[in-house]
Amino acid sequence: MYANKTTRFLKPIFILFLAGISWKGLGQQKQEYWHNKSRTIHYKPEGNAFVLVNGSRKFNRALYGTNTGFRVETGDLPEFALYLPGMGGNFKLGISKETESKWITEADSITTKYTPGMMEYEIHDALLGNGFFKLTVLASAETEGFLLKVEEHNIPEAVGLHWLFGGASGKKFHRDGDIGADPESVFYLQPEYARHNSYDLKENGFTLQFNWDAKSQTNKKTLTAAVPEGQLNLGSAHAIQNPNTLQRATLDSLPVIYGTVDRSAAKTYYWNIEHTTGDTSDKVLSSASAFKKASFKADTLANRIKLNTPDPYLNTLGGTLATAADAIWEDPAFLHGAVAWRMHLNAWRGAYNADVLGWHDRAKTHFKSYGNSQVLEPERGPVVLDSSRNFARQKEVLGTAMFSKGYISRHPNRNDRAHHYDMNLVFIDQLLTYFNWNDDPEFLEEIFPVIERHLAWEKRNYDTNDDGLYDAYAAIWASDALQYSGGAVTYTSAYNYRANTLAAKLAARLGKDPQAYLDEAEKIKNAIQQKLWLPDQGVYAEYQDALGNELLHKAPGIWTVYHAIDKRVPDTFQQQQALHYIQKEIPHIPVQADGLPHEDLELVPTTNWQPYTWSVNNVALAENLNTALALWQGGNPEAGYKLFESALVESMYLGASPGGFQQLSFYDAIRGELNRDF
């Protein structure tokens, strides 16, 4: 009795103690440069835009326009590329005066500004006297196209304005040209890219046939361009060192197209290069009109959601978030990534954006299309291990235990594909969350059988002993190297707890009996608390072994903590203890850079496990943001804000892509920075 009274007295004091601890915790690393590399801030905020402070990268900021795989590559320096997917060509601007010429990437002064969806440059150089050129680049809103507007200001009459385009091979790159996976050089105008390029010069424009097919001996793709009035010529891809060299060279078998602009009183010039099909390649392109529409779309999207805080480094988030979220939408579903991994995988975090951004129609379309992808038969199947994968996976064949009734295939509106992830778990969580935002009884009645079949499928495959604890089979972002061999896993059990809890509420809305879902939810929560909670450590175990001594894994990843909190498994005291575990046991990596006006920024890796391997010990943006959310949910808003701020500032301002959402951070121990708008 005395012990119980003491516990009741000490518990709230301990909660306050934990909540008051600085987020630096005991795991903060010594203030040294990461990998002995000093950093300088890359971009800084200016209103809703990002202005270059220090950098000389090319092709590090993608512009999206049409909700397809097409994008325009821009960067710190004003050299551009089209990606279709596949290399669609490289575009350069140049200037000259008398015998001297250069590409503008070599200009004396370049001011670079990224406003979500649009890149702007101001070019100053000794060749231009006291004048300058202003460039604005967009991706077309209605077609797969590159749009460039150039405005001149006080440019001497003797200055020449030149342009060059070429190198459209149609070749896809390893990871579609993404940061950290493919080198910048894949977008350079490499002479070999120009092989089999066939140009047809027209008045103020051209068409280009490219993407050679050796079997049919024909080109498979077409670009159509409208360019400013002026001289138009073909040159050699071997002679592109500067505009003067290009003009003096002899045409060979690796052609490029170049021109010199007839500078006019209008002092404004447009380029429009579109990826077209045979029946659209002869249409008249209205460059100014296309530019206006693209600018309107980019601006509308960037202003869909606005932040107004005392920190200008966070006020840009609304525009970048909406732009990146729009980039992963390709009707009828959200994709895995905007650049790399631009493919259908139904359960990564992207679809959660839809309701937050007011795209309830997109959310509904996404969920419907994957509801159509649910396997309906057989009712169940045998467990068949894949011998080609060292028996680590189930054989990817429909009709086996995993790929039976209730399984949801990776492609929308197709239920005939087996794949090695349990994408059901997170997808259903997103679907259930949709109904927290939307009172949609008609859709609920339509989709509820999908939820029912999913819950039965999860139970049948991952809680085979009916103890309320579920195995994890490649079910979350970090799952690639996580293996539990049929064990009882905290985070998947937490997902199933929330799923059954919300299914009970939705069943009641439909007039169905919710009791079975309530009973399963209670069983799961009790099992997690009784078998997976570690009272001495104040955290949940990662999992419990299924065999042998049924040992507990007592060093959980941060996903175990934040998923348990997000799914409302722990009580208030347990939340604080579990968050304290992250402070105490997970390393904290200082974020340092010259010119960064923030102090005490730091990130966390996903685990303290060794040795490093992919997906097990990463410094990942989304994982840090999910942990920040858990800190807010767990009653430590100051720490949550600090981690939230740290992750976003590091990604959007220190990272390679201005306003970009990386997958992995510069601080990842082995891979370093990886991907953008992921």
Regions found by a protein language model. Give the residues of each.
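Bacterial Sec-dependent N-terminal signal peptides
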Residues: 1-29, 150
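Terminal accessory carbohydrate-recognition/targeting modules of carbohydrate-active enzymes
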Residues: 24-316, 345-346, 356-362, 636, ...
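Amphipathic, well-ordered alpha-helical segments in soluble domains
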Residues: 89-93, 117-119, 366, 423-430, ...
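Substrate-binding groove/exosite segments of carbohydrate-active enzymes
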Residues: 180, 245-252, 258, 296-445, ...
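Catalytic cores of carbohydrate-active enzymes
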Residues: 315, 380-384, 463-478, 485-491, ...
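Active-site cavity-forming subdomains of large catalytic enzyme subunits
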Residues: 431, 454-458
